[in-house]
Amino acid sequence: MIHKTAIIDTKAKIFSSAEIGPYSIIGPNVEIGDHSVIQSHVIITGHTSIGKNNKIYSFASIGS
């Protein structure tokens, strides 16, 4: 599930079972794996791959 306030670049690959929280930003060339949870206010950019079954906590910033 992708929260309605999340911003997802069209070039990002998000598996259907992943969850993206409110106000998170997912940039191009980012991959979010199966059953991963991205909490609120997270920023993920660059050539970044988050594997399956991961949890990224609120206000984290990952990538370039």
How would you name each of these model-derived features?
Residues 6, 12, 17-20, 24, ...:
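A structural motif detector for beta-strand N-caps
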Residues 63-64:
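Acidic/polar low-complexity surface segments
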